[in-house]
């Protein structure tokens, strides 16, 4: 929430900075003693398709900058976490934003696609997986601009001279923060063979001590995945790794229907 507040403050600061430019003329006789200028204008309706992992903060990132420069916004939040976007729209209305300037539409993917393909949409912003983002970009109306923020498969490369003790906490936190449901989470670690066993054992030791449970409990370090299907998917990945020769260095079990133990 604090990051969302900071994002709103930045958008407010930028309002007065969106200026045009004056261009000195006089390069020809007909333009002597003349000045040209450019003006920036709102481009029109913005469609925003958001993600589930930081629902309020991401909605703010997509909605507030557009409103700050004079563009109305329609946001389609992730169906798993729709209330954050709905509440944001209610807050904006309470703050005095005119009706219609910020709208939240909770719908399935097919209906969400209509927001992108509509010729009335001047700009669309998407946060989510690469395949879906590029697909929507290919279906947008001619002239519609886009901003795509996709997930990654962020690697870390560990050289033999690395400070192992200093990096282990960061690697574990980077991999398991928010149960790994972050676009910039550590997903792959390439370690020089001379220190591979040492690094692997230390990561496993640190990961095995992470507290799994209710995210509302201050002691919890790894909370639930967004739904049961994601827990099934993690379990399938772990089993696939074992089938292909991988060695499990930690526990590898489900905790109820919504959590999976940090596994190395």
Language-model regions: role of each:
Residues 2, 82, 235:
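Conserved catalytic core of two-component sensor histidine kinases
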Residues 1-21, 32-33:
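Long amphipathic alpha-helix in the N-terminal Rossmann-like dinucleotide-binding domain
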Residues 20-166:
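Rossmann-like NAD(P) dinucleotide-binding subdomain of oxidoreductase/dehydrogenase enzymes
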Residues 96, 123, 130-264:
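ALDH superfamily catalytic-core signature
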Residues 1, 23-31, 217-222:
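Short linear capping/connector segments at secondary-structure termini
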Residues 5, 63, 85, 203, ...:
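Short amphipathic alpha-helical/adjacent loop interface patches that line ligand
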């Amino acid at each position: 929430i604090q990051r969302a507040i900071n994002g709103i403050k930045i958008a407010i600061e930028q309002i007065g900075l969106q200026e045009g430019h004056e261009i000195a003329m006089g390069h020809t006789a007909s333009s002597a003693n003349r000045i040209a200028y450019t003006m920036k204008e709102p481009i029109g309706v913005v469609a925003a398709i958001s993600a589930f992992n930081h629902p309020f903060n991401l909605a703010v990132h997509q909605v507030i900058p557009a409103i700050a420069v004079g563009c109305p916004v329609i946001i389609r939040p992730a169906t798993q976490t729709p209330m954050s976007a709905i509440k944001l729209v209610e807050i904006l209305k309470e703050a005095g934003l005119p009706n219609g300037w910020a709208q939240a539409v909770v719908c399935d993917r097919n209906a969400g696609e209509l927001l992108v393909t509509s010729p009335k949409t001047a700009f669309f912003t998407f946060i989510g997986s690469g395949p879906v983002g590029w697909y929507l970009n290919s279906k947008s109306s001619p002239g519609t601009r886009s901003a795509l923020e996709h997930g990654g498969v962020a690697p870390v490369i560990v050289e033999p001279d690395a400070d192992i003790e200093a990096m282990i906490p960061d690697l574990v936190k980077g991999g398991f923060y928010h149960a790994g449901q972050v676009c910039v989470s550590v997903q792959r670690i390439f370690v020089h063979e001379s220190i591979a066993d040492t690094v692997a054992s230390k990561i496993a030791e640190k990961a095995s001590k992470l507290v799994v449970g209710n995210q509302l409990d201050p002691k919890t370090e790894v909370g639930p995945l967004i739904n049961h299907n994601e827990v099934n998917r993690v379990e399938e990945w772990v089993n696939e790794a074992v089938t292909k020769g991988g060695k499990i260095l930690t526990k590898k079990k489900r905790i109820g229907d919504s959590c999976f133990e940090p596994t190395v």
